[in-house]
Amino acid sequence: MEQNEFGLIEKIVYLNRVAKVVKGGRRFSFSALVVVGDGKGSVGFGLGKAQEVPEALRKATERAKKSMIEVPLIDGTLPYEILGRFGAGHVLLKPASKGTGIIAGGAVRAVMEAVGVTDVLTKAIGTNNPHNVLRATVAGLASLRSAEEVGQLRGKKLEAPRK
């Protein structure tokens, strides 16, 4: 977990060396998948490709900063259960009680830590490809709505929950 000068958390999810076969042999380049978040409900991801690793990381970070979304959080967890989908990847995101921690692997864990979630249960279904899992996670988080937003859409006033 790395913080930059703007207080953003940057996480490298996946770094890949790819080869293009040309007449003289193989040409190598790199692709980097990076997640950026502020730890307070904002998160974004980016994919960068270049001939050198640092340049690929820089491009990925720039794209991640441009694709930031807001996520409504309640006491360090999600407001309700959601299923994010992208391609063959499905990611189930469930709110968890205090002290549970982040029960997630790989790409999902990076997103949850960057967005500022402290307690969550997750399950990646259908694929283990980091690109698709990451996009499914972000799609799920992007579709979350706060109680105020839902009330506004329905034209209802928000009341205190019944016990």
From Swiss-Prot:
Gene3D superfamilies: 3.30.160.20, 3.30.230.10. Keywords: Ribonucleoprotein, Ribosomal protein, RNA-binding, rRNA-binding. GO terms for molecular function: rRNA binding; structural constituent of ribosome. Residues 8-71 form the S5 DRBM domain. InterPro entries: Ribosomal_Su5_D2-typ_SF (IPR020568), Ribosomal_uS5 (IPR000851), Ribosomal_uS5_bac-type (IPR005712), Ribosomal_uS5_C (IPR005324), Ribosomal_uS5_N (IPR013810), Ribosomal_uS5_N_CS (IPR018192), Ribsml_uS5_D2-typ_fold_subgr (IPR014721). PROSITE patterns: RIBOSOMAL_S5 (PS00585), S5_DSRBD (PS50881). GO terms for cellular component: small ribosomal subunit. The N-terminal domain interacts with the head of the 30S subunit; the C-terminal domain interacts with the body and contacts protein S4. The interaction surface between S4 and S5 is involved in control of translational fidelity. With S4 and S12 plays an important role in translational accuracy. Belongs to the universal ribosomal protein uS5 family. This is Small ribosomal subunit protein uS5. The gene is rpsE.
